[in-house]
From Swiss-Prot:
Domain TGS: residue ranges: 1-61
SMART domains: tRNA_SAD
Family classification: Belongs to the class-II aminoacyl-tRNA synthetase family.
Gene transcribed to yield this protein: thrS
GO biological process terms on file: threonyl-tRNA aminoacylation
Record note on quaternary structure: Homodimer.
Protein's recorded name: Threonine--tRNA ligase
UniProt enzyme class: ligase
PROSITE patterns per UniProt: AA_TRNA_LIGASE_II, TGS
InterPro entries with a match to the protein in the record: aa-tRNA-synt_IIb (IPR002314), aa-tRNA-synth_II (IPR006195), aa-tRNA-synth_II/BPL/LPL (IPR045864), Anticodon-bd (IPR004154), Anticodon-bd_dom_sf (IPR036621), Beta-grasp_dom_sf (IPR012675), TGS (IPR004095), TGS-like (IPR012676)
Organism: Haemophilus influenzae (strain 86-028NP)
Region (Catalytic): 243-534
Binding residues for Zn(2+): 334, 385, 511
MF terms (GO), sorted A to Z: ATP binding; metal ion binding; threonine-tRNA ligase activity; tRNA binding
SUPFAM superfamilies per the UniProt record, alphabetical: Class II aaRS ABD-related, Class II aaRS and biotin synthetases, TGS-like, ThrRS/AlaRS common domain
């Protein structure tokens, strides 16, 4: 007679084993209708699964994150059901959930077209609208293998052969005539899976191995209701408009080309933004008492073997040879910073030493993963390494966190998700050391008044870390900042300092990145601002234009005055109508357009418009120069009189 304890502490006793759904029915018909699955003793279970002993139970509905993930997973099965009806010879591989959706890898002897995808989606909806029950059956390993052998599914057979113990009892989910295998749970009925959209097809190797066959990966998104789906598709449309690759081309910021995959060709305007970011971060480095250094571009293999990179990171490192020596182009800056620390004897009185670099790094990322500025092979890290004692961890991390928020707020990022990753099973150092390290990070987060999510076991083997993910205007998360403790690398590279008792001790190293990759950060802010960069970042801050040729000399004088004030200004003296010029520079997202006609010349002024079409009136050149200089100096996000 199981006793079921519900989340509110109330209990229900049954005279026989009961399923999750039966408990929901006992609570109420409305809850039963909404039940997707349950969490039994903290473990997700299907609605049909039977509870035989006393247990805690939470009912999972479409309102829960878990419920939404289950809907998405079941939509992957629905996709399998539909494609099998339309293309009976297709072979099904894997169909997991991903952020906001799902995919299914399929093996088909023809390339799927957009018309095919539309037909599959239509069939999925037709099937889901029949509201059929999903039937779960536990079978022996051999029964599962026989089932898929009979159905001609070699990939399912391979999963059984290579990933599932012979003693296991796999779960087969029956969608009418279609059968799939999964850990589950899945929806009990397809009425939960009627708000989805198939999005695209891409290539994907079986098992992610380029030596295996290339499959077709069909991506989709799924939501709990029509409103959520519509809102998500609207966000996708907005994201497409904000795509940094599209805006980067329109604004002539940069380009990529096949001869240098994953490497950026910065054009003048994009490089201007890049240098402004560097200048801004440098002011913060000075404010937070960092020294700036520059390490070599590549180092001998011997050093990378000492750090462990050669053994664990070789696939991502570019290498070259010279005079019978093998070198690796650096994928990160930390080993070089330890070499700088090692020059000269250090005392505990010298610590902490905060060492920053705009380091040019290269990683041999797979070509299929490259994506504009967001995923590149050559990038500039704004990282730093702090060498300190264990006693200084909390205060140094506190300072790092303060710096992270200080910098992010300048760009308008105030919604930041914070995660603390703790000790993994495989780690170096004693439990006491990890206790102190994790406590130090937690105390620093508390000192800054931050809420955070704990990621158990997600720390690196050499130390715990804090991650900072920016949430942008579309609700997307971008993981940029990290504060990582490292108890391993300084020791591997023989870094020591003279302690207060005259013994030699190994310093703790704190890895600290804020923007992360400058290239990627430019991609992020390009999409966040939709190319409407604040005045301090805008490549051209103002364009001065004439109405007729008679104002050309005055325009040149205005440009000189503003340029001499340190502003980035251009003249537009083309023989075009002023309305045409305004439209063109508006499309180029230039913050301010200054029009000079005979009236403005007579008054010694300029008529000022913004890129959003606001007419700000007339100003003397000196007045406008002071306004724009103040905006740049204070790094304001909005233009004059902009809401």
């Amino acid at each position: 007679m199981p006793i079921i304890t519900l989340p509110d502490g109330s209990q229900r006793q049954f005279d026989r084993p009961v399923s999750v759904l039966e408990v929901a029915q006992d609570i109420g018909a409305g809850l039963a209708k909404a039940t997707i699955a349950g969490r039994v003793n903290g473990e997700r279970r299907d609605a049909c699964d039977v509870i035989e002993q006393d247990a805690t139970l939470e009912i999972i509905t479409a309102k829960d994150e878990d419920g939404l993930e289950i809907i998405r997973h079941s939509c992957a099965h629905l996709l399998g059901h539909a494609i099998k009806q339309l293309f009976p010879d297709v072979k099904m591989a894997i169909g997991p959930t991903i952020e906001n959706g799902f995919y299914y890898d399929v093996d088909l002897d023809r390339s799927l077209t957009q018309e095919d995808i539309d037909a599959i989606e239509k069939r999925m909806l037709e099937l889901a609208k029949t509201n059929y029950d999903v039937v779960k059956k536990r079978v022996t390993w051999q029964e599962a293998r026989d089932t898929f052998e009979k159905r001609g599914e070699p990939y399912k057979m391979a999963i059984l052969d290579e990933n599932i113990e012979r003693t296991a009892t796999p779960a087969l989910y029956h969608h009418l005539e279609y059968i799939d295998m999964c850990r589950g749970p899945h929806v009990p009925n397809m009425r939960f899976c009627q708000h989805f959209k198939l999005q695209k097809v891409a290539g994907a190797y079986w098992r992610g191995d380029s030596k295996n066959k290339m499959l077709q990966r069909i991506y989709g998104t799924a939501w709990a209701d029509k409103k959520q789906l519509a809102e998500y598709l609207t966000r996708l449309e907005e994201a497409a408009k904000r795509d940094h690759r599209k805006i980067g081309k329109a604004l002539d910021l940069y380009h990529m080309q096949e001869e240098a995959p994953g490497m950026v060709f910065w054009h003048n305007d994009g490089w201007t933004i890049f240098r402004e970011l560097e200048t801004f971060v440098r002011t913060k480095l000075k404010q937070y008492d960092y020294q700036e250094v520059k390490g070599p571009f590549m180092m001998d293999r011997v050093l990378w073997e000492k750090t462990g990179h050669w053994q664990n990171y070789a696939d991502l490192m570019f290498t070259t040879q010279s005079e019978n020596r093998e070198y690796a182009i650096k994928p990160m800056n930390c080993p070089g910073h330890v070499q700088i620390f090692n020059q000269g004897l250090k005392s505990y009185r010298d610590l902490p030493i905060r060492m920053a670099e705009f380091g040019s790094c290269h990683r041999n990322e797979p070509s299929g993963s490259l994506h504009g500025l967001m995923r590149v092979r050559g990038f500039t890290q704004d990282d730093a390494h702090i060498f300190c004692t264990e006693d200084q961890i909390e205060s140094e991390v506190t300072s790092c966190i303060k710096m992270v928020y200080d910098i992010y707020s300048t760009f308008g990022f105030t919604n930041i998700a914070v995660k603390l990753s703790t000790r993994p099973e495989n780690r170096i150092g004693s439990d006491e050391m990890w206790d102190r390290a994790e406590a130090g990070l937690a105390a620093a987060l508390a000192h800054n008044g931050l809420e955070y999510e704990i990621q158990e076991g997600e720390g690196a083997f050499y130390g715990p870390k804090i991650e900072f993910a920016l949430r942008d205007c579309l609700g997307r998360e971008w993981q940029c900042g990290t504060v990582q403790l490292d108890f391993a690398l300084p020791g591997r590279l023989d870094a020591t300092y003279v302690a207060e008792d005259n013994s030699r001790k190994t310093p703790v190293m704190i890895h600290r990145a804020i923007l992360g990759s400058i290239e990627r950060f430019i991609g992020i802010i390009t999409e966040e601002y939709a190319g409407f960069f604040p005045a301090w970042l805008a490549p051209t801050q103002a364009v001065v234009m004439n109405i007729t040729d008679s104002q050309a000399d005055y325009v040149q004088q205005v440009v000189k005055t503003l340029s001499d004030a340190g502003l980035r200004v251009k003249a537009d003296l083309r023989n075009e109508k002023v309305g045409f010029k305004i439209r063109e520079h508006t499309l180029r997202r230039v913050p301010y357009m200054l029009v000079c006609g005979d009236k403005e010349i007579a008054e010694g002024k300029v008529a000022v418009r913004t890129r959003k079409g606001a007419d700000l009136g007339t100003f003397t050149v000196e007045e406008f120069a002071e306004i724009l200089k103040n905006q740049v100096r204070s790094r304001e996000l909005k233009l004059l009189n902009e809401e």
